Regions:
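Gram-negative outer-membrane beta-barrel domains
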Residues: 1-325, 340-533
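A charged helix-plus-loop insertion that forms the helical arch/lid used to bind
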Residues: 331-337
Length: 533
């Protein structure tokens, strides 16, 4: 007599690894009073690390504890300590390089013989955060700088889904929120004018929070790691109404379209130091920040799978935006100027293309690594110009919305990442991608149209890094047709020693200036796709 297959038990120890990425913010308090602008540094982050844990299962409920640690790559800058247009404010830089956490988990096993675990988690977390507080250009006065590098305990909560692939291996997709209060760190003395005065060194309080998506792979102790499939186990606990949705062993192509509702950001840090100089390029004379760039794009995507586990995938999209703001900050004489302008005629295009290999795959899952390329281009016109910081520096009157400038940006980057797909139930599928961008190349052009002579800045940068994270939950209406909802976060940045070169007739012979560039775009999309087996 053939016995029915046993329900999977999650009890026992495990060890594994993970990659992840997402969005962070570090906030700086202002010891000089309420800030006109800034004080929050966006810190996109990519992380990779490992975890070890233990589960106890009682009926369908699963309880567990887990320790994890990650190394992180992150970068972000913004204005801080901008209490007045008569005080030289600072350029604040922040970025974590290590995360660790100890959490408890509670979840419920459902689906095919208990192979799918949905869980909540919470506990303590630790980060190491480091950065600088650098006075911007002080008009010839000695430049001051303060550095910080600290560890801090905080808290984390999260949720996730873990799928048992074989008796030895499981893959998880997880969202974590982390929050850290911060210490007080030193700020350098700065200059006020008028009346001229040296404001003494002070302190600023820091706090940080992060939204992180992860893909993890766990090995469960006591099982044969080379067992590729479950022994004689049906995919679903009851007979499905139709043919089950599962991955074919032969050639397969899935393609479709998406609508992506997203928000974008672009930042240009313009150093006060000539390219090639020995001074700190973090000392700024100007910064332009384009933010709130809300847009809608249409997109085509596809994935081709071979019988040998090799796959090709990619997407291409085109979008527009007609809202957003640009803050143009300058330091020198006067000490601080900040104008705000609108955005119109916004356009963005993008594509990604990857080749990879599924090193774990079965009838209802695939997990693989990939290498590829990504491209992103954005253009917009800037309208209006209203001064918000210093009454000694005026711009246009409120309501005068003439076009005063434009910006074009083009990004290319190498992608290296992990892709995971698993059928949670008969018709629900979860798909995720996490990619690290180890190298970026940036080219842009800025047009200033409000000056007596129109000026053009040719912008270049490379090195740096980036992160791209995506997740989709799909429902198969038929065996081949599905609808889905997903989320996506993209960020790229260059090294501080990129440059910008004024190329108009009014600045012939001017040297290249150090510059740093960064971008973000994130949002939610809806998709429809069809699979050909």
């Amino acid at each position: 007599v053939k016995l029915p297959p046993a329900v999977w038990d999650w009890s026992g120890g495990y060890i594994g690894g993970h990659v992840g990425g997402g969005y962070g913010r570090t906030s700086f308090s202002n010891p000089y009073g309420p800030s006109i602008y800034g004080n929050v540094v966006d810190t996109p982050v990519f992380l990779a690390g490992g975890q070890i844990g233990y589960n106890w299962q009682k009926n369908g409920w699963v309880f567990g504890v887990e320790l994890d640690a990650s190394g992180a790559v992150s970068d972000g800058t913004n204005t801080c300590l901008a209490a007045s247009g008569f005080v030289v404010s600072a350029n604040c830089k922040a970025g974590p390089n290590i995360f660790a956490s100890g959490t408890g988990r509670i979840g419920y096993a459902f689906g095919a013989l208990g192979h799918t675990l949905a869980y909540l988690k919470g506990g303590v977390a630790w980060q190491n955060n480091r950065g600088d507080v650098v006075n911007n250009f002080e008009g010839g006065s000695p430049q001051e700088k303060a550095h910080f590098d600290y560890g801090r305990l905080g808290a984390t909560i999260g949720l996730g889904v873990e799928q048992a692939l074989t008796p030895a291996w499981s893959v998880k997709v997880e969202y974590d929120y982390l929050h850290f209060g911060g210490p007080s760190v030193a700020t350098p003395p700065t200059v006020q004018n008028p009346p001229f005065a040296i404001l003494p060194a002070n302190t600023t309080g820091l706090s940080s929070n992060y939204h992180i998506g992860k893909i993890g792979l766990n090995y469960h102790f006591g099982a044969d790691p080379w067992t590729a499939q479950w022994s004689d186990a049906p995919l679903y606990a009851k007979a499905p109404a139709g043919a089950p949705i599962a991955y074919t062993a032969g050639w397969s192509f899935e393609g479709g379209s998406r609508l992506w509702l997203s928000r974008g950001r672009f930042q240009w840090d313009h150093s006060a130091v000539d390219a090639g100089g020995l001074e700190d390029p973090s000392i700024l004379i100007s910064r332009l920040t384009y933010h709130g760039l809300d847009g809608l794009s249409g997109e085509l995507f596809g994935r081709l799978d071979s019988p040998w586990g090799v796959f090709l995938k990619g997407n291409i999209g085109l979008g527009r935006f007609h809202k957003g703001n640009m803050n143009d900050e300058d330091w020198g004489l006067p000490p601080y100027v900040n104008t705000i302008s609108g955005q119109t005629n916004g356009r963005f295009t993008y594509y990604t293309t990857d080749a990879g290999y599924d090193f774990l795959r079965g009838a209802n899952y695939k997990l693989g690594g990939f290498i590829g390329w990504t491209y992103y281009e954005q253009s917009s016109d800037t309208t209006g110009c209203v001064q918000i910081a210093n009454p000694m520096a005026t711009c246009l009157s409120p309501g005068d919305d003439r076009v005063v400038g434009s910006q074009n940006t083009q990004w290319n980057a190498l992608r290296v990442g992990l892709s995971a797909e698993t059928m949670l139930t008969e018709r629900w599928r979860l798909s995720t991608d996490v990619a690290y961008l180890p190298w970026t190349d940036f080219k842009g052009r800025d047009n200033h149209l409000l000056r007596e002579e129109t000026t053009f800045d040719e912008q270049r940068g490379n090195g740096g890094g980036g992160v791209q994270v995506e997740g989709v939950l799909s429902y198969f209406i038929t065996k081949n047709f599905s609808l889905g909802i997903g989320g996506r976060y993209w960020a790229m940045w260059t090294k501080r020693r990129g440059d910008s070169l004024c190329s108009s007739s009014g600045c012939i012979g001017a040297p290249p200036i150090f510059a740093k560039y960064s971008m973000e775009r994130w949002g939610t999309f809806l998709q429809a796709s069809y699979r050909f087996d």
